Amino acid sequence: MKKDKRAKKNRDGSRFYRLCYAFFAGIVGFLFRIRVVGAENEPDKGRFVVCSNHVSATDPVVICYAFRKHQVRYMAKKELFSIPFVSGLIRILGAFPVDRGGTDVGAIRRAVDMVKEGNCLGIFPQGHRYPTVDPRTTKTKNGAALIATRAEADIMPVYIVRKNNEFKLFRKTYVVIGERIPFADLHYDPQAEGEYARITAEIFDKVCALGEGFAAEQANTKKKQ
């Protein structure tokens, strides 16, 4: 019984987070003009990693807004935790520090443990922000695949749509939530070489496909008008 309650708390987030969400959601939605597509794809429970393209420093806030049933936690570069206002904000969002100067084994272990405990973790496979750039032309890092396979977690692909892949206040932001990818569908083979790179490529391909599918639907809608 206690385990079930803890898992639910991990999914929903702390009481403080839920209060902050209730207070700020309307403000965030107004400033960023967020529209969520595929909200029905958000799972009610289960361990999973959210993987998205990365356009702006506001992306974690936008994704947290889109996922109503879960608190999406993030790894953030440790330098951000020394900036007073930013540090407070990202801590509310459930972020924890990572040293991007090398392989931060401790941060990876913490991320894996968090997912195993039922927390929802958000990762940007690109590793950096790429505004005004087609995400398919960017490089990716293997952190999402590494954490997902070690935690045996499902993947939730997400694509953030902004005009010209550029963030501006009061410009519409679409968050497209794709269908859950079960861990078994990743076909992870711990004995095979290059598995993390392969899985990362497959995950990010599905992420980008969400954006392309959304663009195609928008184009068809305009033609019919």
Task: Map each language-model feature to its residues.
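Generic non-transmembrane alpha-helix signal with a bias for helix starts/N-cap capping motifs
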Residues: C20, I83, A107-I108, K141
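Short, basic, glycine/proline-bearing loop/turn elements
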Residues: F24, I92-V98, G127-P131
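A transmembrane-helix-recognition feature enriched in membrane-embedded lipid enzymes
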Residues: K2-G38, D44, P84-L93
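Catalytic core of membrane glycerolipid acyltransferases/transacylases, capturing the structured
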Residues: E42-G102, R110
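Soluble or luminal CAZymes and related metallo-dependent hydrolases
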Residues: R15, L19, T103, E195, ...
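Non-catalytic C-terminal accessory region of glycerolipid acyltransferases
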Residues: K2-D12, I108-Q225
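A generic structural signal for well-ordered alpha-helical segments
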Residues: I27-G29, F67, I90, M114, ...
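Short gly/ser/thr-rich secondary-structure transition/capping motifs
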Residues: G29-V37, G102-V105, V158-Y159
